[in-house]
């Protein structure tokens, strides 16, 4: 089942944390869930050039706290904080909430984030770069960032072919069945002249060992953890005794 389910959803509560953290009454859950979707969609669309890796949302009474993980904090904050003020005002109009707090967190290892790698591939495909070249360059960037494995799948009318197909490339290990494996996953859509292309990216950043880190541990903490002993075990020698049939 590790090959079929969402890699992040499978690890929720084990090594990953939820992107939306709040509780509400039974009748309010659908409206608040739709509100979270609107917030994320607006931020991703408004800050398309900001390299948004993830958006976390927390709710406390009437206050909504939004944490934006981005590769370009300067684009999000703007000159003198003007970008944050404008974003906050627009979100208040969108959801009708009075108190909105926005935190901006810079991503340390940009090329170790699946969302940013997928966004890079989408940008190359929309500029009519050959998909194999775009995938190869993305894999090289991820390997330079120190990831232990990466898998990229592109589907659609590749290079303008009449029949749609899917191709994938993998470098390193992607242990989808291992729950302690820190695997990041992202899915993006590229709008090309021949139609839409789907891009999926899996990145294996290492294992989170028991006691070494909790849910949503940073990639830097995962990389600093010691690797388990991988020395091959010696097989025990079996002694055989020669037996002769004596009459």
UniProtKB/Swiss-Prot annotation:
PROSITE patterns linked: KH_TYPE_2, RIBOSOMAL_S3
Region entry Disordered, spans: 213-247
UniProt-listed InterPro entries: KH_dom, KH_dom-like_a/b, KH_dom_type_2, KH_sf_prok-type, Ribosomal_S3_C_sf, Ribosomal_uS3_bac-typ, Ribosomal_uS3_C, Ribosomal_uS3_CS
Amino acid composition bias (Basic and acidic residues), ranges on this chain: 238-247
Lipoprotein in keyword set: no
The organism's place on the tree of life at top rank: Bacteria
Assigned keywords, A-Z: Ribonucleoprotein, Ribosomal protein, RNA-binding, rRNA-binding
Biased composition (Low complexity): 215-227
GO biological process: translation
Pfam families: KH_2, Ribosomal_S3_C
Any GO MF annotation of the entry: mRNA binding
Keyword Disulfide bond: no
Domain KH type-2: 39-108
GO cellular component: a single term: cytosolic small ribosomal subunit
Quaternary structure and interacting proteins, as annotated: Part of the 30S ribosomal subunit. Forms a tight complex with proteins S10 and S14.
Function: Binds the lower part of the 30S subunit head. Binds mRNA in the 70S ribosome, positioning it for translation.
Family: Belongs to the universal ribosomal protein uS3 family.
The protein, known as: Small ribosomal subunit protein uS3
Biological source species: Gloeobacter violaceus (strain ATCC 29082 / PCC 7421)
Gene label: rpsC
């Amino acid at each position: 089942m590790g090959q079929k389910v969402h890699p992040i959803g499978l690890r929720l509560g084990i090594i990953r944390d939820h992107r939306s953290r709040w509780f509400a009454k039974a009748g309010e859950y659908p409206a608040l869930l739709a509100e979270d979707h609107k917030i994320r969609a607006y931020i991703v669309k408004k800050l398309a050039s900001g390299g948004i890796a993830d958006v976390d949302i927390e709710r406390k009474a009437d206050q909504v706290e939004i944490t934006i993980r981005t590769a370009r904090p300067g684009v999000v904050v703007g000159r003198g904080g003007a970008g944050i003020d404008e974003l906050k005002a627009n979100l208040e109009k969108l959801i009708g909430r009075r108190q909105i707090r926005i935190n901006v967190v810079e991503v340390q290892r940009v090329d170790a984030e699946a969302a940013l790698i997928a966004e890079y591939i989408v940008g190359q495909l929309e500029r009519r770069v050959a998909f194999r070249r775009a995938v190869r360059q993305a894999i090289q960037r991820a390997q330079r960032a120190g990831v232990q494995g990466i898998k990229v799948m592109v589907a659609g009318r590749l290079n303008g072919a009449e029949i749609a197909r899917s191709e994938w490339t993998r470098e390193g290990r992607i242990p989808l069945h291992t729950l302690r494996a820190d695997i990041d996953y992202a899915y993006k859509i590229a709008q090309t002249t021949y139609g839409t292309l789907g891009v999926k990216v899996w990145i294996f950043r290492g294992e989170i060992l028991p006691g070494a880190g909790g849910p949503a541990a940073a990639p830097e903490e995962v990389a600093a953890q010691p690797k388990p002993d991988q020395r091959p075990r010696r097989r025990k020698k079996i002694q055989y005794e020669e037996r002769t049939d004596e009459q």
